[in-house]
């Protein structure tokens, strides 16, 4: 049991739960007593994550889901509620990163793909989660934006558009649903030491030493640090926290 949080008897859904921040958050929810629905488009990673948590004695449901397909999202959320009887918390984490590209040369297909996953995917997840939470009259949703939702960096216009958009979705839904007992917030991770970031480093799209030097804390963040922020936003301790975009970035945006 995670001594920091107690979600016994509650149900959480985590998208992109096969690795990185999603897996760390699913693990943290499970260790805090919640039943957890895991979704991911990567079935091998999803099955490995499910096995890890099941072998540890946690209550888990694994669902293959492409968040860019609203029908799949609706089915996953509905299946979660049918299985566990309710939905109390959701972390809409699934997303992709893209290599740098000159804004004048970027193909429309690339813009559409990153926004289909990072923005429309979050919209679809939040939409269908809210349907069930609205019926309950309670719930907490955390959408994964990014440091890139708070600032702009050259070469990543499509990515920044998607992550700025997530904050817009979050604030609008937060204001709409706070009077109904549902809190919606966003977490904005900085550069986090995950498989996705490791892949970017391996491809030469990111220099680890530069990334560490750009953080006032002089290191990359960990997936577990993002998980703790997400769990706090879902906890009673954050009961008066509504519509925030919480940077977890080692001080980057405070510079």
Regions found by a protein language model. Give the residues of each.
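Canonical Rossmann dinucleotide-binding motif of NAD(H)/NADP(H)-dependent dehydrogenases/reductases
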Residues: 5-36
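C-terminal substrate-recognition "lid" of short-chain dehydrogenase/reductases
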Residues: 84, 123-126, 130, 219-248, ...
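Active-site helix of classical SDR
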Residues: 126, 162, 170
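Conserved mid-core segment of classical short-chain dehydrogenase/reductases
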Residues: 97-112, 135, 155-158, 198-202
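Catalytic Tyr-X3-Lys loop
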Residues: 104-123, 138, 142, 159, ...
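Short, small/polar-rich loop/turn modules that mediate ligand/substrate recognition or access, typified
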Residues: 178, 183, 241-243
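Short C-terminal tail/terminal secondary-structure segment
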Residues: 2-4, 97-100, 151, 231, ...
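Residue(s) in the substrate-gating loop at a strand-loop-helix junction
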Residues: 146
